[in-house]
Regions:
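Conserved ABC transporter NBD signature motif
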Residues: 46-56
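ABC ATPase NBD coupling module
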Residues: 57-71
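Conserved ABC ATPase "signature" region
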Residues: 102-120
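Conserved ABC ATPase signature
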Residues: 124-128
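Catalytic Walker B motif of ABC-type/P-loop ATPase nucleotide-binding domains
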Residues: 149-152
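H-loop/switch region of ABC-family ATPase nucleotide-binding domains
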Residues: 185-186
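Conserved beta-strand-loop-alpha-helix hinge in the C-terminal portion
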Residues: 205-229, 233
Length: 242
């Protein structure tokens, strides 16, 4: 598996190539959990249990591997961009890892084509829309070819059209590149069709996990309020007796 979190409150595994949607009420700990999966962003404090990355304790994974293999996209498009040119932003992570120039050029070209960035490749980052900036963040992370891509409410500051386009690109990444995706997202109607697995949190604990269909059934059986927040198609499916 790509990730395994072990503990009395949170037993969860993310297999390679999975698309996991993590959901739950506001303040239940989703962002805190995601940051535990990226040590450079993890909050300070005492952690119980274990987090494994490719069957190795996460704290024993060297920083270079963490930087390259664990991608993270934050909520605000502004918080992650560090250069002033689109092309340089695509190359920055690879430069920081000491990647050779021919490889940087090849990967940047591949990402520009994959994400449709060619038309604004040489533009200033300041000229981009919020949707373009977030797409650039995503492309910059993917240039390092991560094994897992973690996204914390990446569309929260995007307009509906840009958000739909962004989520469609995530589905393409998962299908065509086989990258595991762990996503928290409030637009569940659009995120759930992409999911191979769903995990629901409540008050810092894992409430239930499984396929979208299984989670719908579990929430209905539990009578939990999160059932009403699920996409309409899931609620209808879970309510039909079999």
């Amino acid at each position: 598996p790509t990730y395994t979190a072990e503990g009395t409150e949170f037993p969860l595994t993310v297999p390679e190539g999975a698309f996991l949607v993590l959901c739950g009420p506001s303040g239940c700990g989703k962002s805190t959990l995601l940051r535990q999966l990226k040590p450079a962003l993890a909050p300070h404090g005492v952690r119980q249990g274990r987090i494994l990355f490719r069957d190795a304790p996460l704290e024993q994974v060297d920083q270079r591997t963490q930087a390259a293999r664990i991608g993270f996209v934050q909520q605000s498009p502004e918080n992650q961009i560090v250069t002033d040119k689109v092309w340089h932003e695509l190359a920055f992570g690879l430069e920081s890892l000491g990647t050779d120039t021919p490889t940087i050029r090849r990967r940047v070209a591949e990402m520009a084509a994959f994400f449709g960035i060619e038309d604004w490749f040489y533009r200033d980052v300041a000229e981009l829309s919020g949707g373009q900036k977030q797409l650039l963040n995503l492309a910059s992370v993917m240039a390092m070819q991560p094994d897992v891509l973690i996204l914390d409410e990446p569309t929260s500051q995007l307009d509906p059209i840009a958000a739909s386009d962004f989520l469609a690109v995530l589905g393409k990444i998962n299908r065509e590149l086989g990258t595991a995706v762990v996503l928290t997202e409030h637009r569940l109607e659009e995120a759930f069709p992409l999911a191979t697995a769903v995990a629901v949190m409540d008050r810092g604990r894992l409430l239930c996990t499984g396929t979208p269909q299984q989670v719908g059934r579990q929430l209905k059986t539990l009578g939990h309020g999160m059932f009403l927040a699920m996409p309409a198609a899931m609620r209808i499916w879970a309510s039909v007796d079999t």
